[in-house]
Amino acid sequence: MIMWGLLLTMILIDFGASLRNVYDMKIECPHSINFGESSVTGKVELPPLLLTDAEALVPESSCNMDNHQSMSIIQKVTKVSWRKKADKAQAAKDSFETTSSEVNLKGTCALSHRMVEESYRNRRSVICYDLSCNSTHCKPTMHMIVPVHSCNMMKSCLVGLGPYRIQIVYERTYCTTGILTEGKCFVPDQSIVNVIKNGVFDIASVSIVCFFIRVKGTNYKIMASIKTATANNCNDTDNKVQGYYLCIVGGNSSPVYAPSTTDFRSMEALASLLRAPHGEDHDLSGEEVATYSIAGQIEGKIPHTANAANMLFTAFSGIPSYSSLSVFIGSQDGPVIYSPGLFPRLNQSSCDKIALPLIWEGYIDLPGYYETVHPCNVFCVLSGPGASCEAFSEGGIFNITSPTCLVSKQNRFRAAEQQVNFVCQRVDQDIVIYCNGQKKTILTKTLVIGQCIYSVTSLFSIMPGVAHSIAIELCVPGFHGWATAALLTTFCFGWILILSITLAVLVVLKFFAAILHNSSQENRFKIILRKIKEEFEKTKGSMVCEVCKYECETGKELKAHNLSCPQSQCPYCFTHCEPTESAFQAHYKVCQATHRFRDDLKKTITPQSTSPGCYRTLNLFRYKSRCYIFTVWVTLLIIESIMWAASASETVLEPSWNDNAHGVGVVPMHTDLELDFSLPSSSKYTYKRKLTSPLNQEQSVDLHIEIESQGISTSVHALGHWFDGRLNLKTSFHCYGACTKYEYPWHTAKCHFERDFEYENNWGCNPADCPGIGTGCTACGLYIDQLKPVGSAYKLITVRYSRKVCVQFGEENLCKTIDMNDCFVTRHVKVCIIGTVSKFSQGDTLVFLGPMEGGGLIFKDWCTSTCQFGDPGDIMSPKDKGFSCPDFTGHFRKKCNFATTPVCEYDGNMVSGYKKVMATIDSFQSFNTSSIHYTDERIEWKDPDGMLKDHLNILVTKDIDFENLGENPCKVGLQTSSIEGAWGSGVGFTLTCQISLTECSRFLTSIKACDMAICYGAQSVTLIRGQNTVKVSGKGGHSGSSFKCCHGTDCSQQGLQASAPHLDKVNGIVEQESEKVYDDGAPQCGISCWFVKSGEWITGIFNGNWIVIVVLVFFFILSLILLSLLCPIRKHKRS
């Protein structure tokens, strides 16, 4: 048993170790496969291995896409390593030496000519690795290049490299074909001409990975191009290495070949490679702070059979951070150099003893354009206790959130469309969704209606058509549905309800009447007792027994006490008691006969004669009388019909301001008409009245004021792109020579700072192998790597809040866009924006961490000149300027211990500004945008959330010359074209109207959607001469409503009926489009209006499903038959 237990323990330990060796490689794919030989790439950094194990690595793939066959071929490389000389006890410039040998590797990223192109055509992958080594260990970096078609074929697969397992995860981005950078989809442009046209294209920093391809030919003399780019003194370029770099831009592009004079991407890639030949480091997490011990510069032989040393290296020991694979340029073949523990010299300022990187990674700035962000369509269906929703967009969905739903990460793609499915657990409140910068609202009331209709129809499935028609009315939310249920129940079985309810009411009334009767008799008896007692006390004295001290009510009771109590007997039950007051009192509490004398007195009192009262009347009421039942039945039907029709009214818009002019449709102009209110930035406002003369009501003029939603226009200064990065602290120690003698890889980083402690070593700060004190250098290097663009920043120069105001006063039609503290003045009307409550101010910085359609953050303390690492805006790439690096304000300290290598310490901040902002993002003000338009100098948008408010004042003067104002000559023709949506539901309906305008060129007015009795929605519109298409949205109505397009009191001849309120899919509505307030002072629906609505409903039923009427009449007749059987006519006998 012990052996089995040990074996099981070893298996579990081995299984846990294998789980720890699984790493993820993410490959980002566009969701629309474009034409051309596009490839996608991914990489993953792996933990270090022993040198001998690393040299035996072979990539293995279990993916259903075969790896390119040439990757399994043995690759001969020249291995150059260094070691200490045996005859040297202390370090010096000649105390170490290099050795060169040939080793065989499999699967390194020494790609052959046309390999990637063949892999694309043959649907194969290219899996290879890079090595970053010191003298004892290597860190592998696995790269994978696959055709873009693999994104459709695979979601994930497993690749092996030595002891490691790499899970390849294909992740679809919301980009159609572009590259995801800064949260936006960027499409690079390769034309050089477009770079010259400033402002035509955007500039973005895009990641790039390049692989050197060795191939001979006159067209592949790469050193000649490098000589031109660097102006070095290399003359013998024909005998140098020949080949080119194959690059993939942004992890998703067709191959970019460098050098090339026709592709700007190629030119930028080669320039960046020459500027920083070591590229990005390969530090793992936690290796930001590391120590190198530099042995010094040394030469080696390439290839190993060379007669003399021809390649320059820098020997080091410590954590390997940069690639150990390079290409020797000294011959046309370009031997691959494998140099563990050695930095190859990659600086191309000279021609001798240098190499080119085999694999290079970095960032390049490219011109291009960002993909258009399309609005989302969202719909939901009822699913169980909640709702199942789906959002889709023509392009992609860059951001979707909801405060009321659980938005999943599951995406589906159909061609260029992206779909996101999610679940909302509650439908008792409206579903709010933010998608692609738009606020969508799903009115869940309609979902509940649909479930109700389904349930009622299923319950009466024997007659589904009739049940469906009745369910449509029953399931309307609110009072209308209950009124429908009451009306149908009363019509069919009203007599049962009348009898039952009347009987219940009578029982309750008789119960209370009996209680009141008994209570009055008891009160009369108590009054008599009180009078007897008072008379006895006046004539004979106290009624308190002298023995037991009990207060009696009658004389007989007192006489019994005087006889029994002295004899130790109870005067009521004659039980023996102790002759003490306490004993008697205790007995009286349990005695059952204490009421004996009271009952005798009640019998002697003559009861009061009662006349026929309420109780008797209730007992005689004939509630089963057919006359009573019929009268109540008809009355209830009339009242319920009126209440039913009245309940199908429109949804009243509640303004979010206090209007001090409680206007009506007609306003006599005795005084000036003034409105003063605050209006949310996302709201539109329409005010319409008919102004009449105070002297003659026949003289009038129409007033129509339209105020659009607020527009925000800003003048900005584009600060450029904001970057995130990782700060590294590296210590480089060498025993001899000045610090300036050596080049470190971080010298080519865009942002770096170095502090040198030169010739400062002492005996307490010296490794054992150094020759003495004051001979060497400790270089403390700070540099930023893994740079990644995260957003764009704009400095606010001016902010302008404006609204478009249009006024139709009689024939006069004028419009103007007014700003804050500005007025629009006509002869009779004055509209002013008095002030604006805003969160923006001049000097603020707007930062967009993604598409501008998704909104941004407001920074009050954005640094622009002297920036420290960790400040907002610390790492910037201004447009048309060089890279802007932050200041490192901390102090360096060299920490020493006896006989150990010195270590640099830095007391400054090590966290980037972006990471700090994301950790405290809730403390920053944010804003959403809608209908945004932007350039480098201006940004214009509208606020969809209504977070800002304008204080508005409207003044209409009373000095109107009604006599000289003629009638408006504009003639409006109305025709109803189509209808969408449902009546009586939360979603409502949309009526399409064809409006013709004659006799004038422009006319600002409103078109309403009405049935015969009431209007349910209106749209303010500026008509132009000729035909106009106007869509009017409304909510309300009933199954008999025939909706028409109306202008004032005139309506179209034909009306259309909307669908029943139970759509299978409920579409989301754009919040900003629905936020409008319409005020025309129209009168409310009165009693006559209610009867019209009832008649329209009944007419609609006859014109629609008349089978419902037949069924209802059948149940009505059946109900009458039951009434005649259960409540027969009472027969009276003749006397």
From Swiss-Prot:
GO molecular function terms listed in the Swiss-Prot or TrEMBL record: zinc ion binding
Residues the record marks as carrying a glycan: N134, N235, N347, N399, N928
Site (Cleavage): A648, S649
Zinc finger CCHC-type: from-to: 545-565, 570-591
Regions of this protein lying in the Lumenal compartment: 19-495, 649-1105
Modified residues (Phosphotyrosine): Y615, Y628
UniProt keyword annotations, A-Z: Activation of host autophagy by virus, Disulfide bond, Fusion of virus membrane with host endosomal membrane, Fusion of virus membrane with host membrane, Glycoprotein, Host endoplasmic reticulum, Host Golgi apparatus, Host membrane, Host mitochondrion, Host-virus interaction, Inhibition of host innate immune response by virus, Inhibition of host MAVS by virus, Inhibition of host RLR pathway by virus, Inhibition of host TRAFs by virus, Membrane, Metal-binding, Phosphoprotein, Repeat, Signal, Transmembrane, Transmembrane helix, Viral attachment to host cell, Viral envelope protein, Viral immunoevasion, Viral penetration into host cytoplasm, Virion, Virus endocytosis by host, Virus entry into host cell, Zinc, Zinc-finger
Residue spans, topological domain Cytoplasmic: 517-627, 1127-1135
UniProt-annotated stretches for the region Fusion loop: 757-777
InterPro entries: Envelope_glycoprot_Hantavirus, Gc_C_bunya, Gn-B_hanta, Hanta_Gc_N, Hanta_Gn-H, ITAM_motif_hantavir-typ
Pfam families for this protein: Hanta_Gc_C, Hanta_Gc_N, Hanta_Gn-B, Hanta_Gn-H, ITAM_Cys-rich
Coiled coil: none
ITAM domain: residues covered: 611-634
Motif (YxxL): 615-618
One GO CC annotation: host cell Golgi membrane
Binding to the ribonucleoprotein as annotated region, ranges: 516-533, 588-605, 592-603, 611-625, 1122-1135
Residues passing through the membrane, by range: 496-516, 628-648, 1106-1126
Similarity annotation: Belongs to the hantavirus envelope glycoprotein family.
Protein's name in the database: Envelopment polyprotein
Organism: Dobrava-Belgrade orthohantavirus (DOBV)
Organism ancestry: Viruses, Riboviria, Orthornavirae, Negarnaviricota, Polyploviricotina
